[in-house]
Amino acid sequence: MTATATEPPAATRSVPVISPAPLVPVADFGPVDRLNGWAMTSVVTALAALTRFLNLGSPTDAGTPIFDEKHYAPQAWQMLYNHGVEDNPGYGLVVHPPVGKQLIAIGEALFGYNGLGWRFSGAVLGVVMVALVARIARRMSRSTMVGAIAGLLLISDGVSFVAARTALLDGFLAFFVVAAFGALIVDRD
């Protein structure tokens, strides 16, 4: 073979690299037991619903709100019937953003101004948060068992239990934080 002016000399030619690794990383979308994963999520979510909704509207102290429910339940009721405006003369008490109180107002619109109405939205989001934690843990660990354990741990957590069964704003905040974290985990993949 004759050399041309455009061909590099034999000593400087690049030698193809042969590697046992694939050239493109293989996409890993998590565990392959999808049916078991959704069955686990359904069972854990049903258990969470049982614990969060059982006797949710039972009267406390003659039907009065407990702890800070005495602020948030009336403010949500006011927002419901005053087109989103609180007419609270103690404007110094209106220190929290309205989203949590608007969510409480949804329950009050459905069930009235009572314990079930105050606490319904928090219980729904508390149940959804358990499902989110189970799915997030499963996705991060690639293990259905780890996802189930994470969901069960959140079900048995006392703070999560109380936040989901009362009309306090902490449970709503926790739900949105977990949902945002879940969105980041999905976006990472």
Give the role of each language-model region.
Residues 1-189:
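Membrane-integral, polyisoprenol-dependent glycosyltransferases
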